[in-house]
From Swiss-Prot:
UniProt-listed InterPro entries: KH_sf_prok-type, Ribosomal_S3_C_sf, Ribosomal_uS3_C, Ribosomal_uS3m_plant
Keyword annotations from UniProtKB, A to Z: Mitochondrion, Ribonucleoprotein, Ribosomal protein
Record text on subunit structure and interactions: Component of the mitochondrial ribosome small subunit.
GO molecular function, one term: structural constituent of ribosome
Subcellular location: Mitochondrion
Family stated for the protein in its record: Belongs to the universal ribosomal protein uS3 family.
Organism superkingdom: Eukaryota
Protein name (Swiss-Prot/TrEMBL): Small ribosomal subunit protein uS3m
GO annotation (BP), single: translation
Organism: Arabidopsis thaliana
Cellular component GO terms held in the UniProt record: mitochondrion; ribonucleoprotein complex; ribosome
């Protein structure tokens, strides 16, 4: 009698459990109910329409296990053809992996008080400037009430954004409750004056970075949608990107901000045409950093005194450093916080670009010799005397705690983490299971069976390609550490009149008979004009001593 083997999915570390109810019909039906319930819920939040790209189920993967449910949201950038259109529309911000989740709208639906309340905005097409009436997607009865459809095809976009937010930006800064204290008067007036009178400052990418277009019009939770500039969590909006990456970045201010401000921009070495654009972007970033260094770290208007104060505290940092600190393991906070987060009480804008460049160059050279983590508390005590704003000091103390203890950013200080926690608790109560929601940044699509299966399904839906060409493309992109891959297609592969058949493609070793092998498996169904196609993917990871098995697919 043949030996009954365990299913391949049990071989993964997270599935290895002694729960005997894995094969029972009761729990199988429960998993199916949870999956259907979750998918119907996500599909009803923001369905795709002619005006909106929507929240598509292809952007999330729901994995059910005996004791846990994992929901992974994938936040890709917009297609390139849509990016080129957006270059002529400065009012629209580009889709980035850390902001797309907020635009997709699943969390906003949870906090809405009135499901039938209309939210009207004016969306103008590129060709015909006609008014388009957009409504909240929760009111499904009025989805098709669209007036004045543009002549030209309108691009996909999220129509519930305010295009005229920058007109009232200085007014919002002055009346915001976060800066009503007399200590903030000089800072608010300085920023508002700069916004109103300096058009070149509005066009810079650093302006779009700190003053993003994320505000909502009305509602009881509008305080969560206010500008990042008028929220106390401004520091965490900026630091969120750095703490989500496990590997620390070398602190070159130009490189860091270039990577942060323009994440989708091509490198100058890869595109010859982008050399001039890259240099101009670096110049703008350098000048803007110098402006913040001069205007935000000094209490007086004298540039020479500000330079002396900065040089003095750099020397303090050098005296506190310890042996063993290298350029690749430096901490981001001390000088990043000193250049961006210490506000001042005076008003003054300097126009000496040469002095700015000298100050910036001195800062960049001295940043390589940073203080060690065990001495960072002593340095911060000296840095506190430069600030004078109590709320920022509290935030700085919390940032120190995050760096020293390697914690994540507390959800109560950031609306993103706060809303994710609310959504996690909502889904856990609805499905009676422990639901985990994680926003992930994909390292490589071709090292996870579920992602490869999703990619194949998208290719078969959008355009008819031969299965051999799809498999050949996947084989070329397989990273190191993957020992082998096997893909099987089943169904009516070519024509509706053809009988159903199965084709399997194999690359290297993909043995499913050895229990100790680390194998990932994922099935997916593709709905085509000829019927349903089944796609199954097996990936075998290598476990040699010289290489580590790629079991961690995502970078949290």
């Amino acid at each position: 009698m043949a030996r009954k083997g365990n299913p391949i999915s049990v071989r993964l570390g997270k599935n290895r459990s002694s729960d005997s109810s894995w094969f029972s019909d009761y729990y199988y039906g429960k998993f199916v109910y949870q999956d259907v319930n979750l998918r119907s819920y996500f599909g009803s939040i923001r369905p795709p329409t002619r005006l909106t790209f929507g929240f598509r189920l292809g952007r999330c993967i729901i994995l059910h296990f005996p004791k846990r449910t994992f929901i992974h949201f994938f936040l890709p950038r917009r297609p390139r053809r849509l990016k080129r259109r957006e270059k002529t529309r400065p009012g629209k911000e580009k889709g980035r992996w850390w902001t797309t989740f907020g635009k997709a709208g699943p969390i906003e639906c949870l906090h809405s008080s009135d499901d039938t309340e209309e939210e009207r905005n004016e969306v103008r097409g590129r060709g015909a400037r006609k008014r388009v009436e957009s409504i909240r997607l929760d009111d499904r009865k009025k989805q098709n009430e669209i007036r004045g459809w543009p002549k030209k095809k309108q691009r996909y976009g999220y129509h519930d954004r305010l295009p005229s937010i920058k007109k009232n930006l200085s007014k919002l800064l002055r009346i915001s409750g976060a800066f009503k204290h007399p200590k903030y008067a000089g800072v608010v007036n300085d920023i508002a004056f700069l916004i109103e009178n300096d058009d070149s400052f509005k066009k810079t990418k650093l302006f779009k970075l700190f003053f993003q277009n994320k505000s909502r019009s009305d509602g009881p939770t509008s305080y969560l949608r206010t500008l990042p500039a008028v929220r106390p969590s401004l520091n965490f909006l900026v630091m969120q990107y750095f703490f989500n990456t496990k590997n620390q970045i070398n602190f070159d201010p130009v490189v860091v901000l270039n990577h942060f401000v323009a994440p989708g921009a091509a490198e100058p070495s890869t595109m010859g045409r982008a050399n001039a654009q890259g240099r101009s972007l670096q110049k703008r970033i350098r000048s803007r950093i110098a402006f913040f260094v001069e205007s935000l770290t000094s209490e007086k208007k004298c540039l020479a005194e500000a330079k002396n104060r900065l040089t003095h505290f750099i020397r303090l940092a050098n005296d506190l450093r310890f042996a063993g600190t290298t350029k690749t393991t430096i901490s981001l906070f001390p000088f990043f916080g000193a250049t961006f987060f210490f506000l001042r009480d005076g008003v003054g804008v300097y126009n000496n670009l040469d002095a700015r460049e000298q100050l910036l160059n001195q800062l960049r050279v001295k940043c390589w010799n940073l203080v060690g983590k065990d001495k960072i508390m002593e340095l911060i005590e000296k840095l506190k005397n430069l600030g004078g704003i109590e709320e920022l000091i509290k935030v700085i103390d919390m940032m120190i705690e995050i760096i020293l203890r390697k914690r994540g950013i507390p959800y109560r200080y950031n609306s993103y983490f706060y809303e994710v926690k609310k959504m996690r608790s909502f889904l856990s109560n609805r499905t009676n299971t422990k639901t985990l929601i994680e926003s992930v940044k994909i390292k490589s699509v071709y090292q996870s069976a579920s992602l490869i299966a999703q990619d194949i399904s998208f290719q078969l839906k959008n355009k008819r390609r031969s299965f051999h060409s799809i498999f050949a493309k996947i084989v070329k992109e397989i990273p190191k550490g993957v020992e082998g891959i096997r893909i099987c297609f089943s169904g009516r592969l070519k024509d509706a009149a053809e009988k159903a058949q199965t084709k399997c493609y194999k690359h290297r070793k993909t043995s499913c008979n050895v229990f100790n092998h680390k194998i990932d498996y994922a099935p997916v169904e593709v709905f085509t004009r000829y019927g349903i196609l089944g796609v199954k993917v097996w990936i075998s990871y290598s476990q040699k001593k010289g290489r580590r098995a790629i079991s961690e697919t995502y970078e949290i």
